[in-house]
Amino acid sequence: MPAKGRYFLNEGEEGPDQDALYEKYRLTSQHGPLLLMLLLVAIAACTTLIVITFSYGDPSRHRAVLGTAFFTLAMFVLLYALVYVECLDRRGLRISALLIWGCLVTLGYVLVFDFDSPRKDTLCLWGRCPSSSFVVFVVYTLLPFSMWGAVTAGLVSSISHLLVLAMHQEDFTSPVGLKLLATAVVFVCGNLTGAFHKHHMQDASHDLFTYTVKCIQIRRKLRIEKRQQENLLLSVLPAHISMGMKLAIIERLKERGDRRYLPDNNFHNLYVKRHQNVSILYADIVGFTRLASDCSPKELVVVLNELFGKFDQIAKANECMRIKILGDCYYCVSGLPVSLPNHARNCVKMGLDMCEAIKQVREATGVDISMRVGIHSGNVLCGVIGLRKWQYDVWSHDVSLANRMEAAGVPGRVHITEATLKHLDKAYEVEDGHGQQRDPYLKEMNIRTYLVIDPRSQQPPQPSQHNSKNKGNATLKMRASVRMTRYLESWGAARPFAHLNQRESVSSSETLVSHGRRPKAVPLRRHRTPDRSASPKGRSEDDSYDDEMLSAIEGLSSTRPCCSKSDDFSTFGSIFLEKGFEREYRLAPIPRVRYYFACASLVFVCILLIHVLLLYSMKTLGVSFGLVACVLGLVLGLCFADVFLRCCPALGKLRAIAESVETQPLLRVSLAILTIGSLLVIAVVNLPLMPFRDRGLTAGNETGLRAVSGWEMSPCYLLPYYTCSCILAFIACSVFLRMSLELKVVLLTVALVAYLVLFNVYPSWQWDCCGHSLGNLTGTNGTLSSSSCSWHLKTMTNFYLVLFYTTLIMLSRQIDYYCRLDCLWKKKFKKEHEEFETMENVNRLLLENVLPAHVAAHFIGDKLNEDWYHQSYDCVCVMFASVPDFKVFYTECDVNKEGLECLRLLNEIIADFDELLLKPKFSGVEKIKTIGSTYMAAAGLSVPSGPENQDLERQHAHIGIMVEFSTALMSKLDGINRHSFNSFRLRVGINHGPVIAGVIGARKPQYDIWGNTVNVASRMESTGELGKIQVTEETCTILQGLGYSCECRGLIDVKGKGELRTYFVCTDTAKFQGLGLN
């Protein structure tokens, strides 16, 4: 267990990395809007200075405005440079935001009161409402304030402006109070729409950050899964075989996911290659069967794992590759997958080291065991056959000969052939092995053998060896298995899958969730957090993770999105480059779009209040606003139909319209155009219809106007409020955050052109305001006198309209960029999540191809179990099924590619056998391994041990299922014979009883079962007859109880068991042919 392993990240465990990453994201995501804001303000300041200096008389009379404008411009340029080079930290950006807000507010007040002018004109006083509205708007949308900070700054800007207006009024007549109330409505609308805008952008910003983090986490997990997958594959198969098999699995999963049913090939894929000039070593532990019968399940697994773990270390040191473990038999090859010139010396050295290791065990524990080693050099076919429980194996006549050399060997010695001796180049002394006297096959093939003399045997024993022997004698009173276990545990062999459990950490920032909520306890499942301080690798991986996060977060900054290079967007404009993705983005649903229409309706209400409070009461006012109110009411009714009709289930179709507004682009865009267009029109529709004064009317006849209107103000005083109405209509267009940028640009541009034409070309109100509304305002040269008003009202109206238009266009461009980024990261997250799931499925399939599913859960579950896996079972049915004729069929010649085509047929046989395991009927049958042309399986391993699972009927049912599985194998083999024109027949042996199951081997973990039941089942197969199923007497009794008939064969001699009475199961031909068809 790691020193600082954590399985959960609780609420108090959020490290500084999480806060730092989120703060970095928040500030970086504000860089673009902040720079945009500075640029706009600089342009506005420059424009104002130009207007002051060159268009309106003597600039010396406006020194306060000029000084403030120049200071503000210089401040903005300095801040722009500082933010552009990103030299401001969190506190610096906050201070810069406050400075910008302060400069804007100050400049607004100076514009309201030109203190150097001869008189403070009330028209200028009321005409600066748009400037304060601009400050309120940018506080929410462009400055990096929090929500509470923006609300505070917006309210301060609004209230202070209202207070200034109120304090500079000589008398509070009815029109003054109404104008103050109308101004307050403008500010309330500005604050509410700004807060709406900021709230939705914060939500979108959190979502974007969340998906960015998730996407990076998925990428990291994907890399981890790929490494785990490679480690897992390499723990079972060599690299040159595993990569092809992995690609085949991924392709198969993709075909299944895409539901593409491609026509099957006539043959299954064969992953077998031929290698020449290799040496094969077989080693068997003599006396282990007797020792194993005395071991408990855990002791047996520990002993095997420690012994074979030691052998794996020896194999690695001697450049040998372990192939497989068969019970207590261990065999390996030197010269795979890369040819080695000293392969024979490697194997001999390994054999001598194995004998020495067992000798040390024997001397230390007093247990009578020894090592028998056989080696032969030649050629092999190596690879994987079958579909399930892949195990790397070797086949050839030379492999069979090496196996014979081990069987004919001498305990404690290395037995080699003459072929191996020739490759040793006299590196070792040898003596005659007399193998022909102990094995008939060696005699028949006239194979001369030798025994290698260990150079260490000629050296005097070390004193430490005597000490360990004396220490071993002191413990002889213990059971042999206990002595063996205690001694071998001191070797400290690695546990199975230990390299898979030491997995890369997942940063605590993975627990980030949207809206900044702290996560509750989140299980990390298979991922753990190692002690990075003690692991340079851990630190580098963590640093790379942080670097990747920071790189992605900086990519979210859109300071210059149009100019920056991107693999996802076009060079000019935010258009997706991927074919079809642009259309997918535009047709994607927009959640919560109903609230855009609700906010636009709020803007309509505010415009209505302004008109009702200040403008002339005309029939056209009621008609126009009444029509728009009906239109907006209908739109809101469609958007909120599910809410309004919640109590009427019968009107389900009408309620579905609300969902259609979010999901149907045509309906959504149509309603948006109708809503925005109505607001843009209603803002000025009554302006041309106002009863302006006749051009011939003099200033002395102003009472006539008052008599007509009942108001003590001229239309010129109402122009700022018409301007505010137009600005509010502009803002109503911007609250449709996820709507098309092109649509916003078109609507705003058309509206701006119409407003400018109306305010600059329409003659009546211009003559009224600029000619006679304030008395004699024109000079002798026909120009506006500077003493009449500090600012030209028409010019400032144009300035405010263009300022808001430019700001909203650039802001909409920014929002569109973020919406596209959000959509892009969601798509990347979905794609990489699918990749991650594919990798997880591949890992699961790989692991389940190494271990049974219930055993795999022991290693990959939430508990991260690192203990030995061992399990004892009281009743398991074991089957061995072999194709003995395949040994005769197998030949090595040029016609069959040195045996490769023979193995192709064996692969088809084993693969067809494996396909039977996919049938639900045989779900309880577990394939253990293949040994050459022998197929080993067991039933009853998935049932947990314990008193509650000792149901005899269930245990006996496993035996019946195994018999049916055997008959199905026979049927499959008959089908292969018909297609390949062969006459193979299956020889089956079945036995049931207690077994021990476990996982052994650290470098190549392998699931296996041991026990007398397994040995007897193997003997039932080897002593059986072709086309028959041989069982023991105990198994026969149970089968007869299940309705099977058995034929007594009689007593046969079984190696290690003496004489046993066996039986043949009477299999009905039609029955197993039907099973095969099923």
Swiss-Prot record:
InterPro entries: A/G_cyclase, A/G_cyclase_CS, AC_N, Adcy, Adcy_conserved_dom, Nucleotide_cyclase. Mg(2+) 2 binds at residues 284-285, 328. Residues 1-33, 197-594, 813-1078 are cytoplasmic. GO terms for cellular component: plasma membrane. Keywords: ATP-binding, cAMP biosynthesis, Glycoprotein, Lyase, Magnesium, Manganese, Membrane, Metal-binding, Nucleotide-binding, Repeat, Transmembrane, Transmembrane helix. Pfam families: AC_N, Adcy_cons_dom, Guanylate_cyc. It catalyses: ATP = 3',5'-cyclic AMP + diphosphate. Found exclusively in the retinal pigment epithelium. Residues 477-482 are annotated as: Mediates regulation of adenylate cyclase activity by C5 alpha-induced G- beta and gamma pathway. Mg(2+) 1 binds at residues 284, 328. Phosphorylated by PRKCD. Residues 455-476, 502-545 are annotated as: Disordered. Its cofactor is Mg(2+); Mn(2+). Residues 503-512 have a biased composition (Polar residues). Residues 491-499 are annotated as: Mediates regulation of adenylate cyclase activity by sphingosine 1-phosphate-induced G alpha 13 pathway. Residues 515-529 have a biased composition (Basic residues). The chain crosses the membrane at residues 34-54, 63-83, 95-120, 125-145, 150-170, 176-196, 595-615, 620-640, 669-688, 718-737, 746-773, 792-812. It is an enzyme of class 4 (lyase). Coiled coil: none annotated. Residues 506-584 are annotated as: Modulates adenylate cyclase activity by modulating the binding of G(s)alpha to the high-affinity G(s)alpha binding site in 7C1a/7C2. It is a multi-pass membrane protein. Catalyzes the formation of cAMP in response to activation of G protein-coupled receptors. Functions in signaling cascades activated namely by thrombin and sphingosine 1-phosphate and mediates regulation of cAMP synthesis through synergistic action of the stimulatory G alpha protein with GNA13. Also, during inflammation, mediates zymosan-induced increase intracellular cAMP, leading to protein kinase A pathway activation in order to modulate innate immune responses through heterotrimeric G proteins G(12/13). Belongs to the adenylyl cyclase class-4/guanylyl cyclase family. This is Adenylate cyclase type 7. It comes from Bos taurus.
